[in-house]
Amino acid sequence: MTAATKSLKQDYAIADLSLADWGRKEIRIAESEMPALMAIREEYAKTQPLKGARVTGSLHMTIQTAVLVETLQALGAEVRWASCNIFSTQDHAAAALVQAGTPVFAHKGESLKEYWDFTHRIFDFGPAGSDHEGPNMILDDGGDATLLMHLGKRAEKDASVLANPQSEEERELYAAIKAKLAEDATWYTRKSAKILGVTEETTTGVHRLQEMSAKGTLLFRAINVNDSVTKSKFDNLYGCRESLVDGIKRATDVMVAGKIAVVAGYGDVGKGSAQALRALSAQVWVTEIDPICALQAAMEGYRVVTMDYAADKADIFVTATGNKGVITHDHMAKMKDQAIVCNIGHFDNEIEVASLEKYKWEEIKPQVDHIIFPDNKRIILLAKGRLVNLGCGTGHPSYVMSSSFANQTIAQIELYSHSANYEVGKVYVLPKHLDEKVARLQLKKLNAQLTELSQEQADYIGVKTSGPYKPDTYRY
């Protein structure tokens, strides 16, 4: 019996509720490693700034996410949760939340059909037609929950938007929307009617929001959490620096030292990935389209090449671009026998995985596959091209996720409590003083001692003694 069928009479869909005690023990450990998030929980618990908030959450269902969910609840929110990736759920984390009463719809290894079913179910807060039928807030990672509302609402008026799916993902999404409309023709309009805003976790999701905002089609307010400095410069860089190689090692037990590793993309995620591979003494090459990022890579001592050049020479390939078709079928056809291919960007289309379906696949273990080419060459594909650090590992450490999730919580409070200050259809970032607040809270765990400005020094550089210390244009 699948997780989905087990939950037909219950308001959750998880793998195994008996894992809850294990999950709870790990949640307690994570809480001790998440100082900023726990400090915000303590600061706002009495005032309940999220009382009345109905939060639809679509974000990797991990132990660290469980701490975020319970923080939102401690501040007064009602929460329904699904994972934003079919492989990223930690089943014991999901079980712990369900045991505590949270509706969670996630298990590791979901089908795409289950994924979109679960994403629909996190919008079902109350009876049809009631004032509390749907959410009034979305917390998103990658933008799928936001996409579902927008595309579904468009399809209510024009079914042709679902006519030409371009991928397996789109085929399942479009089928799910068609099925929902067949049973309830105004479901998306009603579910989206009360949504005040969305807070978005990732670069990919932010790009989607900005595109909709530019076109004038974004239905609600949005806060770009990704570009908070204490998110992008820490989660994206330092988180990936630890979790990438953890995922690769767990999946393959490969010796990294001496091998040629190619990192596609040298943004914050690529920078962390390159640092991690070099720390294990790999020869790291970088591919880039942006001359500024390419120059940064070169100045750090990395060799900057094209994927066409690297394809038949490297041993390990990592995509970190947020784009599509970065590693093509032709690239993989040229690769060495036993080359390792993985992705730490958001979606699986960075690698042309669909082009490999015509070949024989041999599962080595869950999320680790040999792809056998006609000449019997094999490449090792990790997590089927989805996030390797969460598909083959446990994702980022708790400490760095504390910064990200503290920003998410602050953003939820800000949008819910002060929605009138934000214009519908616009994308905002959190102010600098809140970024600095998160950093201060994180530093306490490290026993760091901050130097304090005198009033004379503050006047000299034109800031307050309490900050903010940098202009919004400052690049950390």
From Swiss-Prot:
InterPro entries: Adenosylhomocyst_ase-like_sf, Adenosylhomocysteinase-like, Ado_hCys_hydrolase_NAD-bd, NAD(P)-bd_dom_sf, S-Ado-L-homoCys_hydrolase_CS. It is found in: Cytoplasm. It catalyses: S-adenosyl-L-homocysteine + H2O = L-homocysteine + adenosine. Keywords: Cytoplasm, Hydrolase, NAD, One-carbon metabolism. May play a key role in the regulation of the intracellular concentration of adenosylhomocysteine. GO terms for cellular component: cytosol. Pathway: Amino-acid biosynthesis; L-homocysteine biosynthesis; L-homocysteine from S-adenosyl-L-homocysteine: step 1/1. It comes from the Bacteria. It comes from Myxococcus xanthus (strain DK1622). The keyword Hydrolase applies. It is an enzyme of class 3 (hydrolase). Substrate binds at residues 62, 141, 201, 231, 235. Binds 1 NAD(+) per subunit. This is Adenosylhomocysteinase.
